[in-house]
Amino acid sequence: MIIDAHMHYFKIEGFDELAKLAEHENSRWGWQEICEANQIVFSVAMGNSYDAPCRFGGVTPRLINLGGEPFCAQPYNQSDNVGYCLGVQSEEITPDNAEKTAMEFEYYLQRDSHCLGIKFYMGYQNVYLYDPRHEPLFELAKAYDVPVAMHSGETANHHGRLRYSHPLTVDEAACRHPDVRFVICHAGNPWIVDAFEVASKNENVFMDFSGLWEHRLTPEREEEIEDFQKYVRMWMNYHGIWDKIMYGSDWPLINIPDNIRNLGRIVPEKHWNEFYYDNALRVYSRIKVCVAEVFRDS
């Protein structure tokens, strides 16, 4: 069984096009077919949509909407086997609205077991993860025992500022907040060595291996990435933090069978259970309740 610890569940034309390049369909049913064909029992979607109503005068979280527009928490109108992280618009948070923003986020954490964590889009948002404006959200993550995930590494467009997305910035936040779990998304690629060091040093830091390649992988492309895979596996073996690495796809960016197969070439088979399932269940701890409900209803 597999838990996809990093994907997207967002209806937008750009994602529709990405799905086509990966030979998939960016739709609720398209994702369900993928899950059934590849033993994916649950998925963690990163919040992208901007349809959250403002209730407390703060900056609203980005949600998911591929399962139904607009998003609804009660009753939950997305797929039961898809949970989500609340996306943060860091540049809009100010000292005046930071506490009210936390109230906007807490609304979902209080009411929806599918709300699994908080996602920061560093690099796309020109703010460091450890900026004081984020403190109320870190306190919220601690109170509700949910992880903080951070976009790390390269950005999908040239507008991104890479200094904000470097995995070393997670070290600063993790040291200041030892009671909060942090996830370095995309393994910090291309700064994978740095990401491994941050996760190895800090007990509260984990990594997801999503978005390392894109589209459908041709035989020629798979041959081209062999050296990269060996490089990642070398550092994975060196650090041996098998309880800190999680499978992710960044769907609809990548063809799912291609992704599962190629990540399986990096992670030794004896650690597949941890990588593909166990670690995500522990890091995103609310998944346990959701998975139990999925199996009960199936």
Description of each model-found segment:
Residues F10-E13, Y50-P53, E91-T94, Q125, ...:
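Active-site environment of divalent metal-dependent phosphoester hydrolases
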Residues I2-A5, V44-G47, C85-G87, K119, ...:
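Active-site neighborhood of phospho(di)ester-bond hydrolases with catalytic His/Asp-centered motifs
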Residues C35, A73-N77, L109-Q110, A174-C175, ...:
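N-terminal cationic-hydrophobic initiation segments that often serve targeting/anchoring roles
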Residues E17-A22, W29-G58, N81-Q89, L116-G117, ...:
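Divalent metal-dependent hydrolysis catalytic cores, especially in the metallo-beta-lactamase
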Residues C115-G117, Y130-M246:
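Catalytic pocket-lining loop regions of alpha/beta-barrel enzymes
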Residues A52-Y164:
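Active-site gating/metal-coordination segments in enzymes
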Residues E25-Q32, L63-A73, E99-F105, H166-V170, ...:
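Alpha-helical scaffolding within the catalytic cores
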Residues M1-F42, R233-M234, Y238-M246, P252-S298:
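Mid-to-C-terminal alpha-helical segments outside catalytic/metal-binding sites
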